């Protein structure tokens, strides 16, 4: 006898200050990922704009705002810009390894340095090593950590300069959280390189998309995501391709925003997250 299908229960968080747009509040809807069908549910929810944080899938559900837009890169048609080509060339000697979703002290130390520069005073800045382990290891779906290390002459394990917690979905790779050395002496653009590597990796695996999370028009520090072309965004009628002129205009605004921001705070300085979302919620 076939077991009955269990539909997920969804909850909504209480309003909280928006981390992207000053003066606004945010609210999220979320559900728990668990059991034998967690991967299947995560795939289905990912296609309608949900993101994963540990055992929770969530998406914005703000009352008076729809600024957070889910975006994904079309891997088979991706064409890097001249700047992206230079960044890739500068960092292509890095040793890239796919590791099990298991935290290490070396990863945590790199995360702390990253947060100290990119998110000083942010919600994640107070994370301890146990919190980091929970973030990486508490996953009910197919996940891994991709590490980026400098090469060594003798073939020994080199210095860790970047890492990304990544989910493998049925139609692509979902970049859950990436971090890197924000003050490396010679390697600028590490955040961009990690995205480029994911695009190449997905294309080689026959996966059509790389999910980058939410692009927030009006949030200067989120504009870096729109620089990868071609890109699709999730709207009321489903996924649709950015019009070339529309994306070119968004990229121009991103370049302008970059010139106005301190260098240490531009690339990837705000991340999608549902930190503490389970603390205050109502069933819907």
UniProtKB/Swiss-Prot annotation:
Instruction: Show the NCBIfam families listed in the entry.
Output: PRK01305.1-3 (NF002342), PRK01305.1-4 (NF002343), PRK01305.2-3 (NF002346)
Q: What is this protein identified as?
A: Aspartate/glutamate leucyltransferase
Q: Which UniProt keywords apply?
A: Acyltransferase, Cytoplasm, Transferase
Q: Where is the signal peptide?
A: none
Where is the protein found, in the record's own terms?
Answer: Cytoplasm
Please list the GO terms describing molecular function: arginyl-tRNA--protein transferase activity; leucyl-tRNA--protein transferase activity
* Reaction(s) catalysed (UniProt annotation): N-terminal L-glutamyl-[protein] + L-leucyl-tRNA(Leu) = N-terminal L-leucyl-L-glutamyl-[protein] + tRNA(Leu) + H(+); N-terminal L-aspartyl-[protein] + L-leucyl-tRNA(Leu) = N-terminal L-leucyl-L-aspartyl-[protein] + tRNA(Leu) + H(+)
């Amino acid at each position: 006898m076939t077991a009955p299908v269990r539909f997920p229960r969804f909850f909504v968080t209480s309003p909280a200050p928006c981390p992207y747009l000053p003066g606004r509040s945010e609210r999220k809807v979320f559900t728990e990922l668990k059991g034998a069908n967690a991967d299947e549910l995560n795939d289905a929810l990912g296609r309608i704009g949900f993101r994963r944080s540990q055992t929770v899938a969530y998406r914005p559900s703000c009352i008076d705002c729809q600024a957070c837009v889910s975006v994904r890169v079309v891997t088979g048609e991706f064409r890097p810009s001249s700047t992206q080509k230079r960044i890739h060339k500068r960092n292509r000697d890095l040793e890239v390894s796919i590791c099990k979703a298991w935290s290490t002290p070396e990863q945590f130390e790199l995360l702390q340095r990253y947060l100290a520069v990119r998110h000083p005073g942010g919600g994640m800045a107070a994370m301890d090593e146990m919190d980091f382990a929970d973030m990486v290891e508490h996953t009910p779906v197919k996940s891994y950590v991709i590490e980026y290390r400098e090469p060594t002459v003798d073939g020994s394990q080199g210095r860790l300069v970047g890492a990304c917690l990544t989910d493998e979905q049925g139609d692509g790779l979902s970049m859950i959280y990436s971090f890197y050395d924000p003050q490396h002496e010679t390697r600028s653009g590490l955040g961009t390189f990690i995205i480029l590597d994911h695009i190449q990796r997905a294309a080689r695996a026959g996966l059509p998309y790389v999910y980058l999370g939410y692009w927030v028009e009006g949030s200067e520090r989120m504009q870096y995501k729109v620089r990868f072309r071609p890109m699709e965004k999730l709207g009321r009628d489903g996924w649709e391709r950015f019009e070339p002129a529309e994306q070119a205009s968004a990229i121009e605004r991103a370049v302008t925003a970059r010139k106005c921001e301190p260098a240490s705070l531009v690339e990837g300085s705000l991340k999608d997250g549902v930190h503490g979302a389970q603390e205050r919620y109502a069933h819907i």
